[in-house]
Amino acid sequence: MAVRAQFENSNEVGVFARLTNSYAVVAIGASENFYSVFEAELQDVIPICHATIAGTRIVGRLTAGNRKGLLVPTTTTDQELQHLRNTLPDSVKIQRIEERLSALGNVICCNDHVALIHPDLERETEEIIADVLGVEVFRQTIADNVLTGSYMALSNQGGIVHPKTSIRDQDELSSLLQVPLVAGSVNRGSAVVGAGMVVNDWLAVTGLDTTATELSVIESVFRLGEMGPRGVGMGSTNKESIVESFY
């Protein structure tokens, strides 16, 4: 399912939230409707942690994570770290990273199996990403942009990349990630798809400005109509039911 939301007049949902298959981290703020969207879809399924990171609300840009782990910058306070540890499932590893490129959400794009990272991240950071998130790590650019986390949104089902990504690059990335990719936009033409939305295997949340066409592309490439949270990892439904859902 794909839904639209706004965080205090901002459509950049991926700036203020981080969504995975085992938890969600959402910024603390005055946006009740923003929380209610997440709570309506996730409440009984995965924990939603209301948090700040390094005293700021841009939790989606400062963190990177998947079902197995969460990476936070070294500027994260001890209290914030403890709050995350108390709220997130015990199976999720939480690790502070000392890294010059500290907006981890901008420089790391990952699902539960693979991470695409900024070419200039330190070697030690690359090892921590592989260890904590349990993924294969590749240094990559998206349409010649080094900010992989900003210009790509990825789940275990599919991904959306910067609208100017060439067909050749899309094919290359798709075979690397082993998921279908599409070049697209969110929030009425924004190329910053990673910061404009959050997605896991059964839910996408995008900005209120996202058009119906953009939303249908998102639902299609991430295969969001196919299974609810209970069905994650159980394989997808057969093709007939997908075809029927278009009528």
UniProtKB/Swiss-Prot annotation:
Top-level taxon: Eukaryota
Q: How does it assemble?
A: Monomer. Associates with the 60S ribosomal subunit.
| Described function | Binds to the 60S ribosomal subunit and prevents its association with the 40S ribosomal subunit to form the 80S initiation complex in the cytoplasm. Is also involved in ribosome biogenesis. Associates with pre-60S subunits in the nucleus and is involved in its nuclear export.
Organism encoding this protein: Aspergillus oryzae (strain ATCC 42149 / RIB 40) (Yellow koji mold)
Q: Recount the PTM note.
A: Phosphorylation at Ser-174 and Ser-175 promotes nuclear export.
Is the Thylakoid keyword given for this protein?
no
Keyword field: Cytoplasm, Initiation factor, Nucleus, Phosphoprotein, Protein biosynthesis, Ribosome biogenesis
Give its localization. Answer: Cytoplasm; Nucleus, Nucleolus
**Family membership:** Belongs to the eIF-6 family.
- Residues with the Phosphoserine modification: 174-175
Source gene?
tif6
> Could you identify this protein by its name?
Eukaryotic translation initiation factor 6
Q: Which InterPro entries does the entry mention?
A: eIF6
